[in-house]
């Protein structure tokens, strides 16, 4: 089901519809039968992060975040059309459950936070975007205390350091994570892919690439993608260890840096097969 939620069947370029556009009763302006709700988009984002699909999770998260300056500044609206990037007239412009679905995917998804105040434990299972070198989350509540978390990439590891609360126990669900002194050291994948999601112009229909699935093997990364037939798309590649000699099937890896050189990103370009509407493509990286 996660593949379908990430696909154009459910996902527009501005969020996730509440049902498939292939059912007989689909209506893109119906409140419950085809409109796009940021509430559902946020739920899908959290589910994708928990299923270790951070590219789709980040895309849906940033769609919700982008809505905070689309209508009333700082607020997220209640619902939009399921066919065109347009707010529906009966949508509440400041809908609390929509705004909550900006925060929840960030904290519970991207940063992977889980609380157990009874034993003063914070579980941290982050899946930061490949283009992020550092991040800080401030004033995280834990029982009667608050703490800050600093995230810093160091080669093939992500270092998570807490400050501000005594006696906090950090743990993680990510494989290989361990405490080193006062910090949590989390192994990073050898290869990561970055995406820069953007909202389309107002009134647009759905045209952007969709990342349906991502599968990390010992020395491979396979992406299942969906895009408009014959279109070209670009992602970015990050290598967290030297000398990997990454090869790509059905894609071309550029030699020049993408963006700031210190991020270590290189462009990945690929073309979808010819066809009407959305078609699928699989891209595999090996090293």
Region roles according to the model:
Residues 119, 123-150, 158-287:
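Non-catalytic C-terminal accessory domains or segments of carbohydrate-active enzymes
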Residues 37-39, 142, 152-153:
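Broad hydrophobic/π-residue packing in well-ordered secondary structure
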Residues 1-118, 159, 164-171, 183-185:
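Active-site core of glycosidic bond-cleaving carbohydrate-active enzymes
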């Amino acid at each position: 089901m996660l593949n379908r939620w990430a696909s154009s069947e459910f996902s527009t370029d501005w969020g996730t519809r509440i049902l498939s556009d292939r059912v007989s009763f689909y209506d893109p302006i119906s409140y419950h039968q085809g409109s796009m709700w940021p509430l559902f988009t946020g739920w899908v984002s959290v589910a994708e992060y928990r299923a270790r699909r951070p590219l789709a999770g980040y895309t849906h998260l940033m769609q919700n975040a982008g809505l905070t300056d689309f209508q009333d500044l700082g607020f997220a609206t209640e619902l939009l059309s399921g066919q065109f990037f347009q707010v529906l007239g009966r949508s509440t412009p400041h809908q609390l459950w929509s705004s909550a679905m900006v925060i929840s995917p960030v904290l519970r998804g991207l940063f992977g936070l889980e609380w157990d105040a009874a034993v003063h434990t914070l579980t941290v299972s982050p899946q930061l975007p490949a283009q992020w070198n550092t991040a800080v989350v401030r004033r995280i509540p834990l029982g009667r205390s608050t703490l800050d978390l600093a995230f810093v990439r160091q080669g093939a590891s992500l270092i998570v350091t807490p400050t501000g609360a005594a006696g906090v126990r950090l743990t993680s669900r990510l494989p290989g994570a361990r405490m080193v002194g006062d910090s949590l050291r989390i192994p990073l994948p050898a290869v990561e892919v970055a995406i820069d999601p953007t909202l389309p112009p107002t009134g647009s229909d759905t045209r952007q690439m969709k990342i349906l699935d991502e599968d990390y093997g010992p020395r491979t990364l396979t992406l299942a993608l969906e895009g408009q037939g014959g279109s070209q798309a670009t992602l970015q590649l990050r290598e967290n260890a030297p000398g990997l000699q990454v090869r790509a099937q059905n894609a071309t890896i550029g030699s020049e840096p993408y963006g700031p050189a210190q991020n270590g990103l290189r462009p990945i370009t690929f073309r979808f097969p010819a066809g009407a509407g959305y078609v699928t493509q699989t891209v595999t990286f090996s090293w």
